[in-house]
Amino acid sequence: MIIRGFFSALIALAVLVQPTSADETCMSPYMAKIVGQEDYVYIWTLGLEGVGDGEDKLVTVDVNPDSETYAQVIHSISMGGRHEAHHSGLTDDRRYLWASGLDTSKIFIFDVHTDPAAPKLHRTIADFVEKTGGVVGPHTNYALPGRMLITGLSNNRDHGGRTGMAEYTNGGDFITSVWMPTDDNLQGAEKSGSFADGYGYDARALPRRNVLVTSSFTGWNNYMMNLGKMMGDAEAMKRFGNTVVIWDLHSRKPKKILDVPGAPLEIRCAWGSRSNYCFTTTALTSKVWLIYEDETGEWQAKAVADIGDASKIPLPVDISISADDNHLWINTWNDGLTRLYDISDPFAPKQIMEEQIGEQVNMVSQSWDGERVYFTSSLLANWDKTSASEGNDLQYFKLYKWDGKSLTPEFNLDFVELGLGAPHQMRFGAHALYGGMTAQSPSGLITTPPAH
């Protein structure tokens, strides 16, 4: 249930947020990384009625400054309707991009290797709910060796927050599913505090520690509900997750359930070979949480920083950790700000800058070298703002240059003006991934993932 002190403030504000995942520094450790200049950004975009064809679509933008079509939309492919386009993720070989819909529970698999500039629909998974035994709302698409791990947000019995995860082959064949631990079925997990709610959201792996970490949000009944209606429903406002679960990565069995009250969302794990910790933020309480392994080998959760003025409900959404583990970008949707935290001491993060990005801001993705930072705006169809104050953008894809001190705008694409819709998840592509450029190309790779 939601912390009481924030309940009335949320009702009064009548805003809540559904955020998402990020970019090159936040991808699966099983993947090669683009460490030079990315060539393309693939943007999973929510269709808007009255905007273009009104359909969800995968939009490709050229982001290589040496290209003749730099800062332009060079390709888009529509999905035949609106599915509540939300998250996407690449397979470990980066040949396929998986993109899912939270409403229809369909998953679209795109071929991004044959022609990285023009992805093609390879396969559609339309029986996700049936195959998984009732999981609804495929959310995070996360690469494991030869497999994709898909987290759910809901179920087909009561469309609440209890849910599970599924595994597929890279080609889209179902393997297995597992449900989140609950009070009535802990599945052998240790309940360390007050909660075992069975909710799901994001997932990240630390293979060298044999650990998988999952977070929790809310179910279909809430994320597909009209925002105003939901905010006026006291029972609906109680249905948000308060847990992070530590899993045995190899067996996929839950080990420990941690209390992280207030809807813990994105999980971002440190890259250092001795850095056994991850960060998350709570949407309802505006806090940074550290999920860490202590000196005894036990996993713990600790609130380590505030995000803005919690009384004003800034609503933290997407986060992105730098490749050197020293900085964490945190977007807050309600005020349209991005904030940068110094996390060199993970137990004492400090905010060092903030910047207005738009009327609302959701996703943040950075290049591996940290020099380029991308932003998009959309949350959910029934939750997005419908107008912007003077001087602020509403639905956009933006690139900024980062020099270690300040953000400098590079370009801004208005997705409504372009007839595309509401931009959400971003993923990077590069010709060098598929042998399409020489070793001297500005696009580069880490061919073997770093220790993680």
Show the residue positions of the predicted features.
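Blade-loop segments of beta-propeller domains
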Residues: Y70-T140
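Asp-box/WD-like beta-propeller blade repeats and closely related beta-sheet repeat scaffolds
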Residues: H113-L206
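Short loop/turn segments immediately following beta-strands, especially the blade-tip
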Residues: V61-E68, I109-P119, T169-D173, L290-Q300, ...
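Beta-strand-rich domains and repeat architectures in extracellular enzymes and scaffolds
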Residues: D23-V63, Y70-R95, A99
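Beta-propeller domains
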Residues: T91, G193-R339
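Beta-rich, blade/repeat-based domains predominating
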Residues: T25-A32, D53, G80-D92, E130-L144, ...
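Short, conserved, GDST-rich strand-edge loop motifs in beta-rich repeat architectures
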Residues: I43-D53, T151-G161, S215-R239, T376-F397
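Loop/turn-rich, solvent-exposed surfaces of beta-rich toroidal or solenoidal domains
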Residues: S311-E390
